[in-house]
């Protein structure tokens, strides 16, 4: 049985010349469970959190090294984006095509091509949710990840972890075309 979400990620990466290696494992919805399976995977493993702002019209994906702790209050201050809360499963599905426990930058392939050539939002896309660049999501990455040679994320499903080089992550983000920013996460 094939997993459509994982296959979609693999297809996108391969179509764009992004090298990757995927490791399959039981569902790992939390970092605590994942650490046991990640021991044999040579990469920097990441934690990925998805937040809407207090109005629900802006969405932020925050990616950082999995051993770090994140204070939402500190994040709110540093991002200057207002009050943040964890996204509901419905919002995750709508914006990233993901379910809780599977949040990943690879979900950004579902944050592409949201507007028509004339700039109007495609069907099912609310204009109020779009940033000026035509994407629903702004990405914040931990500055320390710039030093990682390899990084790993769930390929839109928590039954696998996909490893790519940092250079290929940057290529992926360029293909996505949305806004991202490097931030300090203690």
Residue ranges, per PLM feature:
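Extended, low-hydrophobicity, polar/charged segments
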Residues: 1-186
């Amino acid at each position: 049985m094939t997993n459509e979400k994982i296959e979609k990620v693999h297809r996108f990466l391969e179509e764009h010349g992004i090298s990757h290696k995927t490791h399959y494992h039981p569902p790992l919805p939390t970092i605590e469970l994942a650490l046991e399976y990640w021991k044999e995977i040579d990469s920097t493993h990441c934690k990925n959190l998805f937040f809407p702002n207090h109005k629900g019209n802006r969405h932020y994906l925050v990616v950082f090294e999995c051993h770090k702790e994140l204070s939402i209050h500190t994040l709110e201050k540093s991002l200057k984006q207002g009050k943040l809360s964890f996204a509901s499963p419905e919002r995750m599905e709508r914006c990233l095509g993901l379910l809780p426990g599977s949040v990943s930058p690879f979900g950004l392939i579902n944050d592409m091509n949201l507007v028509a050539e004339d700039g109007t939002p495609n069907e099912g896309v609310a204009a109020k949710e779009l940033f000026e660049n035509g994407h629903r999501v702004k990405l914040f990455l931990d500055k320390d990840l710039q030093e990682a040679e390899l990084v790993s994320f769930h390929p839109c499903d928590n039954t696998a972890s996909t490893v790519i080089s940092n250079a290929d992550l940057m290529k992926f983000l360029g293909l996505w075309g949305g806004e991202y920013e490097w931030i300090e996460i203690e």
